[in-house]
Amino acid sequence: MIPSPIQIKQPTLKFGDTGDYVKQLQKFLIKRVPDIQSLVIDGVFDEITLLAVEIFQYRTFLKQDGIVGVVTWEALYIGQRPDLPLLYSGCHCDDIAKIQSVLKFAPFIQETLGMKGYYFGKIDGVFGDRTQAAVKSFQNDKQLVVDGIIGSQTWDYLMELAALISHFVL
């Protein structure tokens, strides 16, 4: 696991909250999710702020709950999830299901983006042969070391792909 470089002490924020911490959140979201042009810094955690939080969480492989807790705050500060695990064949976890989902993106997204999907199996959270083949194909396309292991460079490119397809899935 890649260690978290900083510890953030901010309150947990959710839909309906107001105040200066929400303004700070909105400033980070404008920087991290610039494609949400209707997001304004007004200190109100409204539907647009919620959408921006969920998009950011999706793009950084965080739990998509719309709640800004410690890990989401840390990710907002550093621009990516702070606790990215090293994943490889045989692993079982929620992160793998999220990766499978991103690598499997729907045919209509494939047509729109002019890209193929990478994963064609069941989204089951198991890093098996199909997931490993998908990761290797993805690594090859991105000109990374093709080892089937999801380390920091592969995570970076997966987050780029998640950002690209988030327009279609959220």
Feature-to-residue mapping (PLM):
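Cell-envelope/ECM-targeting effectors and their regulatory/trafficking segments
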Residues: M1-L170
